[in-house]
Curated annotation (Swiss-Prot):
The lineage of its organism: Archaea, Methanobacteriati, Methanobacteriota, Stenosarchaea group, Halobacteria. One of the primary rRNA binding proteins, it binds directly to 16S rRNA central domain where it helps coordinate assembly of the platform of the 30S subunit. One of its GO terms (cellular component) is ribonucleoprotein complex. It holds the Pfam family Ribosomal_S8. Gene3D superfamilies: 3.30.1370.30, 3.30.1490.10. This is Small ribosomal subunit protein uS8. Belongs to the universal ribosomal protein uS8 family. It comes from the Archaea.
Amino acid sequence: MTGNDPLANALSGVDNAESVGHLSHEIQPASNVIGSVLEVFYDRGYINGFEFVDDGKAGRFEVELSGGINECGAVKPRYSAGADEFERWEKRYLPARDYGALIVTTSHGVMSHYEARETGIGGQVIAYVY
C-alpha cells in the first residue's frame, strides 16, 4: 500500500481483510500510533491479538482478526474534541449510540472515547471502529 497516511492504510487493510474473511493481516510499516490503536481494538474485543515483528526495517504488525469488525477507518482531518463533545462525533462516525468506538489521541495516550469521557479529558479523534 502506498500513501501519505500510514494509519489510514493500516485500518483500510484491516477493514478489507475482515470483509473477505481472512483470519490474519500484516500491517507494514509499523508505528507507535498504529500499535496503540491496535491495543484499543484488542481491549474492546475487535481483534484477537497482534504482535510486533522486527524485520530490521520499520517493522510490522501481525494482527489476528476475530471477524468482529464491521467497519473501521481513519478520521480525516483529525478533529479536536473536548470531553463533553464526543457525542457529536459519535453521531457522525458510529451507526448507533453505544455501538462501536472512536479512537482518540490525548495527552494521556491513545484510548477509546469511552475512556476519555470517563477520565474527563479531550483530544483528537483519529479513527473509528464498529
